[in-house]
Amino acid sequence: MARYTGPATRKSRRLRVDLVGGDMAFERRPYPPGQAGRARIKESEYLLQLQEKQKARFTYGVLEKQFRRYYAEANRLPGKTGDNLVILLESRLDNVVYRAGLARTRRQARQLVSHGHFTVNGKKINVPSYRVSQYDIIDVREKSQKMIWFEEAQENLLDAVVPAWLQVVPSTLRILVHQLPERAQIDVPLQEQLIVELYSK
């Protein structure tokens, strides 16, 4: 199954959640398309579980097969499977770039990482799904820092609010991973227990 690259607002409306962040079109019409979208049908337990999984997938830009691997790993780790799943998704390099304020959306962050603009601990990484670890140091490559986008991002970072588990140094465009996030620190509107129930069947 290919990655969805169509209008993000359409997916947001279908799943009734802003998958982009600051999507004004979704805020104007936060209901599913068609029939004015306002009439809510009675949703089965399975449908709710499926929607929650799709919400997680599209929020983080993950394919179905890849998402199953994340779930399998989350299930093997100690602790709550649902919490582990969200933490694994949040620890993706593209998401960290987005959370740090170096990209407006996760989709843009994924493109920036894919194009090789970042290093992790001095090594060039162009894999968006690369999992960061505690104490990792993420830098924008020196030649990439001259790009207009990063120059503008550098100015915006002065007023940016980043999660407590990250630190950003605006002057050098450096991201420091102080620790991996805890579930309570991740502000995504997910009911991950529904996903666990879906895969537990």
From Swiss-Prot:
Transmembrane segments: none annotated. GO terms for biological process: ribosomal small subunit biogenesis; translation. It comes from the Bacteria. One of its GO terms (cellular component) is small ribosomal subunit. Residues 91-151 form the S4 RNA-binding domain. Keywords: Ribonucleoprotein, Ribosomal protein, RNA-binding, rRNA-binding. Pfam families: Ribosomal_S4 (PF00163), S4 (PF01479). InterPro entries: Ribosomal_uS4 (IPR022801), Ribosomal_uS4_bac-type (IPR005709), Ribosomal_uS4_CS (IPR018079), Ribosomal_uS4_N (IPR001912), S4_RNA-bd (IPR002942), S4_RNA-bd_sf (IPR036986). PROSITE patterns: RIBOSOMAL_S4, S4. One of its GO terms (molecular function) is structural constituent of ribosome. One of the primary rRNA binding proteins, it binds directly to 16S rRNA where it nucleates assembly of the body of the 30S subunit. With S5 and S12 plays an important role in translational accuracy. Belongs to the universal ribosomal protein uS4 family. NCBIfam families: PRK05327.1, rpsD_bact. This is Small ribosomal subunit protein uS4. It comes from Corynebacterium diphtheriae (strain ATCC 700971 / NCTC 13129 / Biotype gravis).
